[in-house]
Regions:
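DNA polymerase sliding clamps and clamp-related checkpoint/processivity subunits
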Residues: 1-31, 36-164, 169-270
Length: 270
């Protein structure tokens, strides 16, 4: 077992961004899927990788130092964040607010200063950082070719409309994807389905698996991460998760890796 992270030799850093509202949405998304995790902070930016309790959803965040007006730490440091604590602060942010985040040299807390555009509202807060043991999640390299893009607003609508269904089936072809309410063995009578890209009935599927609908519903917040946001869908092979990639305004990117639940043997052909 790896030794616990020593948070005593701490390295200071700070950043200022006008994309505070998008970071608020990101904090909500992280809280809904991950309990706690270390963030790596270095001269390239801030990196967070963590999974839900069942490890069926893995989220990978990259925030760019160059887009955050960041003064990086003198060397790479790790900060242990409880995401429910982070969201308690971030939920106070309103549209057009700016955000200053800092950590003083030798401190075990992360400081937040929320400012509005008129500079007549200024809120200070902090969270305590926590000792968290790293989980070694690795992600495979996916082909650069995108299967298709999905409007984030449509993804949010679809997950909300199907929230009462326990399962959803995802079928992938070379240039398209279809989401179906229910499982192949028990499709819902409503016949709800959504297609993106150039999915065609009659063509063989590369992939067909069953997912818990709540797993997808907890990702609906991706719609708020950027203006006119789109999700890029990538597929590697039958044994690896589906990859969804989203911009985080102009300051970073989010990759989500979702794995299916096992309900029954599912045919891979239409």
């Amino acid at each position: 077992m790896a030794a616990p992270i020593d948070v005593k030799p701490k390295h200071g850093f700070s950043l200022v961004t006008s994309s505070a509202y998008h970071l608020k949405i990101l904090s909500d998304l992280l809280k809904s899927n991950i309990k706690e995790q270390n963030a790596r902070v270095n001269n390239k930016g801030i990196f967070i990788r963590g999974a839900d309790e069942k490890e069926n959803t893995l989220i990978d965040v990259e925030l760019y130092a160059s887009a955050l007006n960041m003064e990086p730490p003198s060397s790479e440091t790790k900060i242990g964040i409880v995401f429910s604590h982070l969201h308690e602060i971030m939920r106070r942010i309103k549209r057009k607010d700016s955000l200053h985040i800092s950590r003083d040299e030798g401190s075990d807390q992360l400081n937040f200063n929320i400012m509005n555009a008129e500079k007549d509202r200024d809120k200070d807060a902090f969270i305590r950082l926590k000792d968290i043991q790293d989980d070694p999640w690795d992600v495979p390299v996916y082909p650069e070719q995108v299967i298709c893009t999905i409007p984030a607003s449509e993804f949010q609508r679809m997950t909300k409309e199907n929230a009462k269904q326990k399962y959803m089936t995802i079928r992938i072809q070379k240039r398209g994807v279809k989401f179906i309410a229910g499982t192949p063995q028990q499709p819902q009578l409503s016949g709800m389905e959504d297609r993106y890209g150039k999915y065609k009935d009659g063509e063989d599927d590369l992939y067909c698996r069953v997912f818990e609908t709540k797993q997808l519903t907890k990702l609906a917040k991706v719609n708020g991460l950027a203006t006119n946001n789109f999700l890029k869908l990538y597929w590697l092979d039958d044994e690896h998760p589906i990859k969804l990639e989203s911009a985080i305004d102009l300051i970073g990117r989010l990759c989500i890796y979702i794995s299916p639940v096992v309900v029954a043997q599912v045919p891979t052909a239409q």
